[in-house]
Amino acid sequence: MHITILNGPNLNLLGTRQPEVYGATTLADIEHMCQRKAQALGLEIEFNQTNHEGVLIDQIHAARSESDGLIINAGAYTHTSVALMDAVASVSLPTVEVHLSNIHARESFRHTSFLSPVALGLICGFGATGYVMALDGIWAHLTAADSARP
């Protein structure tokens, strides 16, 4: 099974950007954590980051033919992008939305997620561990779906 993990704007600055909110873990650290977890679960992952909404949409579209599931931390686009919501809905892949911080405990504009209505699940507030939790969750969903097939 193949999982695409997408990261949106400013996540390339993790480790130095507002460590009091996002922690000291870098995106490279998170990728390494995901690689270890994926290997333990027998998954292959593709890990990407971009600051550009259109590139995220292109990567979501590409996942349609390359992946069995999607994990996405869309950063601030979570709260603003109908286009990302439409892209996720259009590919019909099980999708887990991840956020390092608890978006519901922050500014009110962060309480709205355009992705949640089209996602299988949402994990927020657990820092970098949320990505590992997302891999566990999507693996459990996919293997349960496989075992339910005749």
Curated annotation (Swiss-Prot):
Pathway: Metabolic intermediate biosynthesis; chorismate biosynthesis; chorismate from D-erythrose 4-phosphate and phosphoenolpyruvate: step 3/7. One of its GO terms (molecular function) is 3-dehydroquinate dehydratase activity. Keywords: Amino-acid biosynthesis, Aromatic amino acid biosynthesis, Lyase. Its EC number is 4.2.1.10. GO terms for biological process: amino acid biosynthetic process; aromatic amino acid family biosynthetic process; chorismate biosynthetic process; quinate catabolic process. Substrate binds at N73, H79, D86, L100, S101, R110. The active site is at Y22 (proton acceptor), H99 (proton donor). Coiled coil: none annotated. It is an enzyme of class 4 (lyase). It catalyses: 3-dehydroquinate = 3-dehydroshikimate + H2O. It comes from the Bacteria. The record marks R17 as: Transition state stabilizer. NCBIfam families: aroQ, PRK05395.1-2, PRK05395.1-3, PRK05395.1-4. Catalyzes a trans-dehydration via an enolate intermediate. Homododecamer. Belongs to the type-II 3-dehydroquinase family. This is 3-dehydroquinate dehydratase. The lineage of its organism: Bacteria, Pseudomonadati, Pseudomonadota, Alphaproteobacteria, Rhodobacterales. The gene is aroQ.
